[in-house]
A protein has these predicted regions:
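Short Gly/Pro-enriched turn/cap motifs at secondary-structure boundaries
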Residues: 44-53, 100-103
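Gly/Ser/Thr-rich phosphate-binding loop
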Residues: 1-44, 58, 65-70
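Active-site glycine-centered loops adjacent to acidic/histidine catalytic or metal-binding residues
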Residues: 18, 51, 109, 133
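AMP-binding/adenylate-forming catalytic core of the ANL superfamily
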Residues: 83, 88-89, 110-197, 203
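Glycine-centered tight turns that cap/initiate beta-strands
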Residues: 10, 56, 150-153, 201, ...
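Flexible lysine-rich "adenylation lid" loop at the C-terminal edge of ANL adenylation domains
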Residues: 66, 194, 205-207
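Active-site glycine/GP-rich loop and adjacent strand/helix microenvironment
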Residues: 51, 70-73, 89-92
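Conserved beta-loop-beta connector loops within the AMP-binding
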Residues: 56-80, 115-116, 178-182
C-alpha cells in the first residue's frame, strides 16, 4: 500500500506507532540524515518499519528471562519502553507493578530493532509461538502464506507438541476456484522460511 501511494499518487506515507500508555506516540518513521539518497526499494524497507523512538522515549527488546537482545534487525523479543510520558501504573493499581526494575513498560508486542534504531513489530507476545526455545512469529508466517496464489486467507496457531512445547499449524482459506493442498503450500513456504518455522501441518477451511 505504501508503494502504491508513492508511485501512483506521489504521496509519502510516514509510519508511526504508539499506545494509550505512551500518551500516545512511541516511534515515528522519519529518515536519518542521508537516507533520502537510498534507492526506492531501500527506502520502502525502512518505511515498512514502525520507526525510531520519539523524543525522550527509550526502547529495548528482551528475551523471556529479561535479558536484553541486540539491535541487529534480526533478533526479536519483548518490546519495552521507558520515558516521562509513559504510564507507571494503572488506575487503582489494576495489574499490579507494570514496570521492570529499570522502569521499562512491557508493551505486549514482539519486535526487532535494527542497528540504526528502527523498530519493527512482528507479533503480539500472546500470539507468538514458542517452539523448542525459539520464537516463531505467527503474523510473519501468515503474511508469507497469503502470498501463495491459491490462498486467500491464512491464520497460524500454536498447537501442543510433547518435545518442542508448541509447533505452528497453518489454516488456509483457498482462493476462489482454487484447490491448494498441503504439499504445494509447504513447498511454496520452504525457501522463504527457516526450516524450523515450517508448519507441521496445513488444514483448509471454507472461511
Amino acid at each position: 500500500m505504501l508503494e502504491k501511494f508513492e508511485k501512483n499518487y506521489d504521496v509519502s506515507v510516514i509510519h508511526a506507532w504508539g499506545m494509550t500508555e505512551m500518551s500516545p506516540l512511541g516511534t515515528i518513521g522519519a529518515f536519518k540524515s542521508g537516507m533520502e539518497e537510498l534507492s526506492f526499494d531501500e527506502k520502502m524497507d525502512i518505511k515498512l518499519k514502525q520507526g525510531r523512538a520519539s523524543y525522550m522515549v527509550e526502547m529495548k527488546i528482551t528475551d523471556d528471562d529479561g535479558n536484553e537482545l541486540p539491535w541487529n534487525g534480526k533478533d526479536f523479543g519483548h518490546l519495552l519502553v521507558r520515558g516521562p510520558f509513559i504510564a507507571s501504573k494503572y488506575m487503582k493499581g489494576d495489574g499490579g507493578q507494570i514496570l521492570d526494575n529499570q522502569g521499562f513498560f512491557d508493551t505486549g508486542d514482539v519486535a526487532t530493532i535494527d542497528e540504526l534504531g528502527f523498530m519493527q513489530i512482528t507479533d503480539r507476545s500472546k500470539d507468538v509461538i514458542k517452539s523448542g526455545g525459539e520464537w516463531i512469529s505467527s503474523i510473519e508466517l501468515e503474511n508469507i502464506a497469503v502470498g501463495h496464489p491459491d490462498v486467500a486467507e491464512a491464520a497460524v496457531i500454536g498447537i501442543f507438541h510433547p518435545k518442542w512445547d508448541e509447533r505452528p499449524l497453518l489454516i488456509c482459506v483457498p482462493a476462489e476456484g482454487k484447490e491448494p493442498n498441503k504439499d504445494n503450500v509447504l513447498e511454496y513456504l520452504q525457501d522463504k522460511l527457516a526450516k524450523w518455522w515450517l508448519p507441521d501441518d496445513v488444514v483448509f477451511v471454507d472461511e
